[in-house]
């Protein structure tokens, strides 16, 4: 998935105002949630073999948040990694040797999780994860359905490249 495709697809995520209001979510929180799926084009036209580099360099990702995933203001290349974002406090990066996306312990080169076989599949899978998380936040019983959440996490891992990636998405969904 290309950065531009990812940004356009995020705009299509259905934030259910009516159901969120029924849950007592404030109008401001609903607007904040909607803006967490928006990344405005900031120009520059950076071209890279890595869609994640194009995303961070060409779009304002300051409000973009998918689950616990956030994006940095700029790309930083250090050693064998291109750092592009965070999962909570830990670093998300593209491994320049393998091309895979990994989660590294904050400030260290220690890989905690393998996230995707490449950054294109990472964009595709976190888009799918965002859609599911949004649905799970408003549909009765979906959050508590551990079996379904495990199935979804494994499905997301398969989109990311296979069984090697299941653990990251299980952790992301809290199962």
Model-assigned labels for residue ranges:
Residues 44-148:
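Long, low-complexity, intrinsically disordered segments enriched in glycines and aromatic residues
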Residues 1-93, 159-175:
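A surface-exposed partner-binding patch
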Residues 1, 18-21, 106-110, 137, ...:
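Charged, low-complexity surface segments at secondary-structure and domain boundaries
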Residues 134-175:
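Acidic, proline/glycine-rich low-complexity IDRs
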